[in-house]
Swiss-Prot record:
This is Ubiquitin-activating enzyme E1 3. Signal peptide: none annotated. It comes from Triticum aestivum (Wheat). Belongs to the ubiquitin-activating E1 family. Gene3D superfamilies: NAD(P)-binding Rossmann-like Domain (3.40.50.720), Ubiquitin-activating enzyme E1, FCCH domain (2.40.30.180), Ubiquitin-activating enzyme E1, inactive adenylation domain, subdomain 1 (3.50.50.80), Ubiquitin-activating enzyme E1, inactive adenylation domain, subdomain 2 (3.40.50.12550), Ubiquitin-activating enzyme E1, SCCH domain (1.10.10.2660), Ubiquitin-activating enzyme E1, UFD domain (3.10.290.60). GO terms for molecular function: ATP binding; ubiquitin activating enzyme activity. Pfam families: E1_4HB, E1_FCCH, E1_UFD, ThiF, UBA_E1_SCCH.
Length: 1053
């Protein structure tokens, strides 16, 4: 099952940030340290602008643990570079990179920090300065001497990517027995094969096994039974599972359950469950109650490496079509270590002698493996392993860099469940379908030698000549550009990589979009990313555009552009953009490589012409929206309160000022539009404009404070008093049931107090933003709560009396809360007349300033007001309040995101890219993947083939388009279908009907050219660059059965 298509990475939109120290030229970057010494730093405050998307995944406590963690990464091949990059972006306290080897041309295939100028330098020393650029808040140092156990004691976690087994045993023994234990990770990438081993010590506590919020339920009833049956409201399915622990709160009647004691769930069902508790003698349940899952820490006992090698236990599977693969790869990696020990090198690519020697070693180890002995050794697989074992391929490094980077985060924080303990992966399906000759695998002393040693020079040439389109240059886009540059995609004069993104760089982008720096803020994402990718590989032939890929830009991304493409890679952050790109790839029959992330989760989907279904073939169910009446009158969770708060913010500060300006800009036109509408919504708009220009008009900052204070009274006191007057606590429905039954919560009016800091904070943010919208000067004392209190306490607040007959919407299906009145037209006329008078009292040229919600600026008071609105409303309804950061996540609709899942997703996509560019791969070679690094879980599956439709001997899928050549008349087109045994009874172009055999007058069109009818009827203007007209045709066969045929293109030019 693929994850939701909604969440995704943001390539062309709202992205993560980085901040802290300025890192522009002259910002005083730290110099790389030549050796690892003790690193000390004062406790850091979390830069919430920088880490907002990461905070949404990890939370503050995990981030604080990361900020206190020192990590060693040993082995700066491509994998080591990826791991170090992800840790620097995550924001650990320090990263020490270690290597004793020097840079060779071979390394440039996998390590994006290196260039040809670095050849001959120490690998760690060559990387340290560029690694430091990623995050100045992380202390980066290089260690270039031989590593000993004494070096390890200062680290919380150590990672090795280039170490022999004997040395790994020595270091792991030291880390395993150290007090406290040092988390040890060993990972290797050998061609298209990879491994990870984790040892976090004899006892390691996982504080949060999955990172999900505790599941909750709203109780509808509880039985007095043994065991007790709890039924919940049927608004949402329960997520509890048997064995979960839950606690109860707010239960009326059966108050014994409110003791905070965790109780075990049994017989979990969609809307009910039982608990291991005898409630026979408890009080009778009356109403209310919330049940909440208790997440308990989990203690894991890791084995040391030398013990785990002989008894690896159950190994996590990534691909269920390779159920027997883990023990095979466990043997292969052991054989490789022995081969390197015997020969001092890896097996040579395509060398039969080395492959034979490798097989002999593997057979000997297997014979000595006792009860773990394999029945047979897959010689073909072992030869493939040996041949590519020296190569650290960039896609594999990116994928494993994401996995290992996440394991380090787990080791340092206890957040998420670690690997237990081995993980193996291979992608041999990425190899070309044709045989690879030894001559084709030989190095030629260029930066692609490692990749050539696996795939051969023929595929390398095809990759360099590929015409590639990357849509979006955010987090996914940056990773893709790095990967493509290292792989050599579009890196010849015959190839071209086009990247487009209409977004600019913001501070909140930088913590995952690693090609950007502080000094790039405000610049176009695509051009900065393209420049950075060209620095990684100067041969990259890239064109950066700032156009959104959408119907409005089809003159830019025209037919000729699309027809020349070899592959399209999506790096988008919203479903609508994905659907559009899917439609275009279907139309032009181009492969689409799709991916997305949501926190620690990621998914990739391959859309291959004629082999797989398209992206749009499977749609997620629409997100459940809370009914309008729930949000506005009956909230029962903080999400409802925040939805209401954002709606009020936009109404008060953006929509109403825009309405005011529309009226003032052209009163006559505005009045005509309101009269034409003549409904309750028009009346309400005019009422708000009228209030802004008269009763609520602000000329001084004191006016703004007064407005804010009266708004507080209206929102959190008067409205609640009216609601509870209309529906008192003992109110009943028309069926006689209690009106205030779950999930409704009975509200209480708030009494304003200047001694309550949250009340004053609301007044402060509301008055400052009101002043901004009216262009009123904001005094320096506006942020002084004591002076603010003095002003507020002098404001006279009218006494509120609830009214009879007020209509409050309770219908959950209602989509509009406006109440229609027979007097609407008369009221509109009266309001328009008053507005004309109010306008005369304004200064000439007066306009309000609409304020558009911006969540990522903590100095603009937007989130202060929204969180204030939401929390005061939550207080009305006894709903737990949230801090401003949590409010920002929910109200700002922030997509949780981390660098590790992004890196992994792009690595997986690029492993599929090898198959796409090579061509001739069957559908069973491709993989769609869903992964959750938090669990961890990897689920790979073959893509679903497209649905095949048939008529007689003709078959087609969604990928097909019927082409009709020639500038045909309508009669000739109808005959073209008749020749296929089909009757075309209706022909349309866009939304216009060109022909229907039921309409007699349409017979007059039979002699006209189809394109001329389209120009006349549909007002189609076919651009010069397009040679054809697309039409939709409804057909039936001889038996009058409808036949769903593909899109038809008439090539008239």
């Amino acid at each position: 099952m693929l994850p939701s298509k909604r969440p995704s990475d943001a390539a062309a939109g709202d992205e993560n940030g980085r901040g802290g120290d300025a890192r522009g030229p002259g910002s005083g970057r730290r110099r790389a340290r030549a050796a690892a010494g003790a690193v000390t730093a004062a406790p850091q405050e979390i830069d919430e602008d920088l880490h907002s998307r990461q905070l949404a995944v990890y939370g503050r406590e995990t981030m604080r643990r990361l900020f206190a963690s020192d990590v060693l990464v040993s082995g700066l091949n491509g994998l080591g570079a990826e791991i170090a990059k992800n840790l620097a972006l995550a924001g650990v306290k320090s990263v020490t990179i270690h290597d004793v080897k020097t840079v060779k041309m071979w390394d440039l295939s996998g390590n994006f920090f290196l260039s040809e100028d670095d050849i001959g330098k120490n690998r760690a020393a060559a990387c340290v300065a560029k690694l430091q650029e990623l995050n100045n808040a992380v202390l980066i140092s290089a260690l270039t001497e031989e590593l000993t156990t004494e070096h390890l004691s200062k680290f919380q976690a150590v990672v090795f990517t280039d170490i022999d087994l004997d040395k790994a045993y020595e270091f792991d023994d030291y880390c395993h027995n150290h007090q406290p234990p040092i988390s040890f990770i060993k990972s290797e990438v050998c061609g298209l094969f990879g491994s990870v081993f984790c040892d976090f010590g004899p006892k390691f506590t996982v504080l949060d096994v999955d990172g999900e919020d505790p599941h909750t339920g709203i109780i509808a009833s509880i039985s007095n039974d043994n065991p007790a049956l709890i039924s919940c409201v049927d608004d949402e399915r329960l997520e509890f599972q048997d064995g979960d622990l839950v606690v109860f709160s707010e239960v009326h009647g059966m108050t014994e359950l409110n003791d905070g004691k965790p109780r075990k769930v049994k017989n979990a069902r969609p809307f009910s469950f039982s608990i291991e508790e005898d409630t026979s003698n408890f009080g009778i349940y009356v109403k209310g109650g919330i049940v909440t899952q208790v997440k308990e820490p989990k203690v894991l006992c890791f084995k040391a490496l030398r013990d785990a090698m002989t008894d690896p236990g159950e190994v996590l599977l990534s691909d269920f079509s390779k159920f027997e693969r883990p023990p095979v790869l466990h043997l292969a990696f052991q054989a490789l270590d022995k081969f390197k020990k015997d020969h001092g090198r890896c097996p040579a690519a395509g060398c039969e002698e080395d492959a034979h020697s490798f097989l002999k070693i593997a057979a000997a180890i297997n014979e000595a493996s006792a009860d773990r002995k394999l029945d047979t050794i897959d010689e073909k697989l072992f030869r493939q392993f040996a041949s590519g074992s020296r190569a650290v391929l960039n896609p594999m490094a990116a994928m494993f860099g994401g996995i290992v980077g996440q394991e380090v985060v787990k080791a340092c924080s206890g957040k998420f469940h670690p690997l237990n303990q081995f993980f193996y992966f291979d992608s041999v399906e990425s190899l070309p379908t044709y045989p690879l000759e030894p001559q084709d695998l030989k190095p030629s002393n260029n930066r692609y030698d490692a990749q050539v040693s696996v795939f051969g020079s023929k595929l390398q040439k095809k990759m360099e000549e590929a015409n590639t389109f990357v849509v979006g240059s955010g987090a996914l886009g940056c990773e893709f550009l790095k990967n493509l540059a290292l792989m050599g995609v579009s890196c010849s004069s015959k190839g071209k990589l086009t990247i487009t993104d209409d977004d600019i760089i913001e501070k909140s982008n930088l913590s995952r979009q690693f090609l950007f720096r502080d000094w790039n803020i405000g610049q176009a994402k695509s051009t900065v990313a393209a420049t950075a990718a060209s620095a990684i590989n100067p041969s990259l032939h890239i064109d950066a555009l700032q156009n959104r890929a959408c119907p409005d830009t089809e003159n830019v991304f025209h037919d000729t552009f699309w027809e020349g493409l070899d592959v399209v890679i999506n790096a988008l952050d919203n479903v609508n953009a994905r659907m559009y790109m899917d439609m275009r790839c279907l139309y032009f029959q181009k492969p689409l490589l799709e991916s997305g992330t949501l926190g620690a989760k990621c998914n990739i989907q391959m859309v291959i012409p004629h082999l797989t279904e398209n992206y749009g073939a499977s749609r997620d169910p629409p997100e459940k929206q809370a009914p309008m009446c729930t949000v506005h009158s009956f909230p029962h969770n903080i999400d409802h309160c925040l939805t209401w708060a954002r709606s009020e913010f936009e109404g008060l500060l953006e929509k109403t000022p825009n309405e005011v300006n529309s009226f003032l800009s052209n009163p006559a036109q505005y009045a005509a539009a309101m009269r034409k509408a003549g409904d309750a919504q028009a009346r309400e708009l005019l009422e708000r404009v009228s209030e802004c220009l008269n009763k609520d008009r602000c000329s001084t900052f004191d006016d703004c404070i007064s407005w804010a204070r009266l708004k507080f009274e209206d929102y959190f006191s008067n409205r609640v008093k009216q609601l509870t007057f209309t529906f008192p606590e003992d109110a009943a429905t028309s069926m006689g049931a209690p009106f205030w039954s779950a999930p409704k919560r009975f509200p209480r009016a708030l009494q304003f107090s200047a001694a309550d800091q949250s009340h004053l904070n609301f007044i402060m943010s509301a008055s400052i933003l009101r002043a901004e919208s009216f262009g009123v000067a904001i005094p320096e004392w506006a942020k002084d709560t004591s002076k603010l209190a003095d002003v507020v306490n002098k404001i006279a607040v009218p006494t509120f009396e609830p009214k009879q007959g007020v209509n409050i919407v309770t219908d959950e299906k209602a989509s509009n809360l406006s109440s229609t009145s027979v007097d609407d037209v008369a009221v509109i006329e009266d309001l328009l007349a008053k507005l004309q008078e109010y306008a005369k009292m304004l200064l000439p040229g007066f306009q309000m300033k609409p304020i558009q919600f911006e969540k990522d600026d903590d100095t603009n008071f937007h989130m202060d007001l929204i969180s204030g609105l939401a929390n005061m409303r939550a207080r009305n309804y006894s709903i737990p309040e949230v801090d401003k950061l949590k409010a920002k996540f929910i109200a700002g609709r922030i997509i949780p995101a981390i660098a590790t899942s992004t890196a992994m997703a792009t690595g997986l996509v690029c492993l599929e890219l090898y198959k796409v560019i090579a061509g001739e791969h069957p559908v069973e070679d491709y993989r769609n993947t869903f992964a959750n690094l938090a669990l961890p879980l990897f689920s790979m599956a073959e893509p679903v083939p497209p649905k095949v439709m048939k008529h007689k001997e003709t078959s087609w899928t969604v990928w097909d388009r019927w082409s009709v050549q020639g500038n045909l008349t309508l009669a000739e087109l109808l005959q073209w279908f008749a020749d296929k045994g089909l009757t075309a009874y209706s022909i349309s172009c866009g939304t216009s009907l060109l022909y229907n055999n039921m309409f007699a007058r349409h017979k007059d069109r039979l002699t006209k050219k189809v394109v001329d009818i389209a120009r006349e009827v549909a007002k189609v203007d076919v651009p010069e660059y397009r040679r054809h007209l697309d039409i939709g045709v409804a057909c039936e066969d001889e038996d009058e059965n409808d036949v769903d045929i593909p899109l038809v293109s008439v090539y008239f030019r």
